[in-house]
Regions:
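Active-site beta-strand/loop microenvironment that shapes enzyme catalytic pockets
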Residues: 89
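Short connector loops at helix/strand junctions that flank enzyme active sites
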Residues: 43, 112-114, 129
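Conserved short alpha-helical segments that host acidic/polar catalytic motifs at enzyme active sites
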Residues: 94-103, 107-118
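A structural-propensity feature for long, helix-poor, extended segments
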Residues: 117-136
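Compact, glycine-rich, soluble single-domain proteins
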Residues: 79-81, 92-95
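Non-catalytic linker/capping segments at the edges of enzyme domains
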Residues: 1-82, 102, 107, 123-124, ...
Length: 196
C-alpha cells in the first residue's frame, strides 16, 4: 500500500501487521520511516479492528487470537500455563507505537512507561480472544527533535471479560536510533539513555 493509503486506513489485517513488522507494508515510505512492530511470536496483535483520530486524541481496538501452543504457555509456567501480564502491557505499547506511525510520526518506536497497571484476571490456553481497547489521550509531534509521543489508557478483555487496565501508557518514535545493520557493531549497536 502507499504511504497515503497507510495513513488513511482504519483497520489492518494480520498480513498487513506482519508486513509492517518487517518494514515492507508501505511501498513509498518517507525518509525516516523506521517504525516497526515486533515480529511473531512477540507480535501480540492479530488484527486492528479500528484506528481513528479526533484532534490530538484517538482510539484503537485490536484483537489477538489465543493459541493453545503459544510460546509463552510452554514456559510460563510449567503445570500452570498463563499468558504473562506484561505481554498485555506490551501489546498496549505496540498499539501506541503503531498509532504514532499511522499519525505520520517518523523514527523508531520505544515504550516510555506507564502509570498504574491493574490485573484482575488471566489468559489461559482455552481462552479464545483478547481484545485491546486504547483511548489515545494525547498525540504530540515535537518539531525540534522530530520525535512523536503518544499517551493512552488501555483496557484488556479476554472473551469479553475485562481483565486488566493500563493507565497513562506512553510510547514514542525517535529519529536516528534504528539499528538496521544488526548484528554488526555500529553507531546504534549499544543502548543506553535516549536523552543523550
Amino acid at each position: 500500500m502507499t504511504y497515503d493509503e497507510f495513513k488513511s486506513s482504519s483497520r489492518f489485517a494480520p498480513e498487513e501487521l506482519i508486513a509492517f513488522a518487517y518494514g515492507i507494508l508501505v511501498d513509498d515510505p518517507p525518509a525516516g520511516f523506521t517504525a516497526r512492530l515486533p515480529a511473531p511470536p512477540f507480535l501480540m496483535l492479530d488484527r486492528i479492528l479500528e484506528i481513528s483520530v479526533n484532534g490530538r486524541q484517538g482510539r484503537i481496538i485490536a484483537v489477538q487470537e489465543i493459541r493453545m501452543d503459544a510460546w509463552y504457555f510452554q514456559c510460563h509456567m510449567p503445570a500452570d500455563p498463563v499468558q504473562p501480564g506484561c505481554l498485555g502491557v506490551d501489546a498496549i505499547w505496540q498499539l501506541l507505537g503503531f498509532y504514532c506511525a499511522w499519525r505520520g510520526g517518523l523514527g523508531s518506536g520505544r515504550a516510555l512507561g506507564c502509570g498504574e497497571v491493574a490485573f484482575n484476571g488471566q489468559i489461559r490456553p482455552f481462552n479464545r480472544l483478547v481484545r485491546y481497547e486504547v483511548d489515545v489521550r494525547r498525540f504530540t509531534h515535537l518539531k525540534e527533535s522530530g520525535a512523536s509521543i503518544v499517551i493512552g489508557e488501555g483496557r484488556l478483555f479476554v472473551d469479553n471479560e475485562e481483565i486488566a487496565e493500563v493507565h497513562e501508557a506512553r510510547t514514542g518514535l525517535f529519529k536516528g536510533i534504528a539499528y538496521p545493520d544488526y548484528p554488526r557493531r555500529s553507531a546504534n549497536s549499544v543502548g543506553g539513555r535516549l536523552d543523550k
